[in-house]
């Protein structure tokens, strides 16, 4: 009975240790499924550590297996103790010696099997973290280029006073350009019913009408091209799994902005076709400056979203998949450490504020264009011989609609003098903000902690702000020539692009990119251990 009492615990412990060691070599399907989930990353790390211990040698593997079971630890503790007991002490002692030798042989065989099979056994792969493909980034840059083009064409359409030449909004029929003489005359007759023709353009010929019609038609066709070009590839991206986590929602948001942009365009044109609206605008046949600013602002938002999302996705891919540094930094560690630093964080806030300022200045330019405010006070730096116009011109009761004159704020958006003055002040503020940011970034201890690309983009923003300010002054002095004014509008978008790129260069990696980078580093370490 005594021998059975000794044999059963020791044999059970040895068998338990052997089963535990053997189970390390091949994961069950449930474990493999668990490892492929997000929570399985920790399980995969444990498997990688086990593989390292097993490949390090039978001695270390014996310790790892022994640590996994209390019964196994008792066996190894017994095996590791020095043999001070005499073999001939007693029959019970001899039996214990035989059991110990058997347990040692059984466990050693199991460990050897685990060690030899560790290199060929299949451990669960780490879960794949989907990242937005570089193909999507290039696609967004193409859309951004098309938006840039439509902003320029839209500026030319406004400057040539062509925006009211097409009096209908037909998404399908509007694609067809009039071809025959009869079709052109039919469109011309429709235009003759508009307030613009009755008040300003009774002198134009059919050939003149064709010219302004082509500008508006080109603007609308380019808008349709942008819509189709944006929506068409999305099903493929979803099917081919080219989109990372949250990317589809971002694309849906941009698509919504594009749709709102098209609707706002027609809503803006309607304000210039309706006679009552024209009377509300002072009897001048032009579109509402509020709707014009909203139309331009939506275009800038679409452009900004495409540029920022495209750059962010490209940076995440480069960091997590290629494991390369960003912004001129050479290593991943240097990139993450730099972007998490206080200097990068402070600069990120400054660049974000500057981006908002550039955007606001561009919107104020839309009010200048909508009110033809560039045709007054065509001098610089003064306005009527002073740095600012007389106060009674800035705050007129004429623009108030309430009897108590409590809506004087309308002067900010409806008084041409106030609108031009505001645009000047915002332009000065933007210029000196860019200069201040450059002087801040060029300080040696600041520059050394910023990505080299960020400094170059800030420097480029400084150069572009000088050019943009010069274009604005020249446009004012020469009474708003068409091509110069269109270049000034395009310059605002170039400046916004540089500031957006500077902000994107300071963007910290997304959570998805960090997770993908962590798994890539684990795979790299596992490959080194296997070798």
Locations of regions flagged by a protein language model:
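Polytopic transmembrane helical bundles with strong interfacial aromatic enrichment
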Residues: 2-8, 12, 27, 32-531
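N-terminal alpha-helical interaction modules that lie
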Residues: 11-19
